[in-house]
Curated annotation (Swiss-Prot):
Fe(3+) binds at H76, H78, H242, D317. GO terms for molecular function: imidazolonepropionase activity; iron ion binding; zinc ion binding. Its cofactor is Zn(2+); Fe(3+). Zn(2+) binds at H76, H78, H242, D317. The gene is hutI. It comes from the Bacteria. This is Imidazolonepropionase.
Amino acid sequence: MNDLIIQNIKELILPKSTERPLKGKELGELNITENGTVVVKNGKIVYAGEHSDAYEATETIDATDKVVSPALVEAHTHLVHGGSREHEMSLKRQGVSYLEILEQGGGILSTVEATRKATEEALFKKAEKNLLTMMEHGVLAVESKSGYGLDKENELKQLRVSNRLAEKYNLDMKHTFLGPHAVPKDAESNQDFLQEMIDLLPEVKAYADFADIFCETGVFTVEESKKYMEAAKALGFDVKIHADEIDPLGGLELAIDENAISADHLVASSTEGKEKLKNSDTVAVLLPGTTFYLGKESYADARGMLDNDGAIAIATDFNPGSCVTNNLQLVMSIAALKLKLSPNEIWNAVTVNAAKAIDIDAGTINQGDKANIVIWDAPNHEYIPYHYGINHAEKVIKDGKVLIDNRIKLEQ
């Protein structure tokens, strides 16, 4: 006997399962089955496709007039951090740039101070609350970065919290060491601090899957980033890079040359960098919510990347300074409006391609897959990015069991 049947599905979203990320025109190819059925046994997908009455189960969910998709994949977050920075909103309104705020001791450095002061338990409780909000909005696979410690003790503290959250919720979660996220005030020099973070790599290997670095004006150069990435790769890390967020330094080109699993931000990436995506499986993780929150007008050139047969994913960049949202659905709407992505492209970018960007087995509903599914209170897949700012996730199903039922919460 099967455990669960989801029947009468108005639209069943079935992203392609591929070894590599979807690139170029492939991103717009999305299998949508009308009047679909999903069957689950022992936490795994038994069947997903056209309507079928051939199966029996102990529980049946009627998804009439609903959309069913894989659970969303959140490919870029700064989940574990102390404090908040709401006071910076007025500075941004006055036109003060992010780098200027950073130079004044704000930005990342103010979060570093708050994170260092916070106990591990305080960080855990804060991160747990934000993680649960992500899950309520349909996310069941998450990448979580450190980067607000900037020293051994506090970077490890953040990574321990991230690992504890994954264990508590048995969650598909990847952990990223972002030690070189900024240069602390007490550093002798950028180069000395970078070497300190390189020396820390062997110790964080037990807690982190990826090594990441912020390659940007005033932080780390392309040459410094290359040194760090190659040291991390030599220890067995997959590497990522925050690149070309503000200036076109060549971070995207470096990511491709170093075979990084992803390059993130890419607002200012060069034409040459975008052209290099054609022959690379490095995923361009675009963060339009950050551009929106910072009030900037220039967004990452998603269409140009796709025209060059690049692979892109969409994520929130949830953090306390430049994108204070853990609602990936909202960022899907921003991606439609500002990145000019189609609904099909967006769905692939937050499921299968996001999973490739963090090397995790998620984002599809195929026979044998984990039954991590969302039932959406929406008439079709286009409606979710269209009706922005609210939570359309009605039921979040993890390993074949209803983990979150937002409809029950509303009725209560």
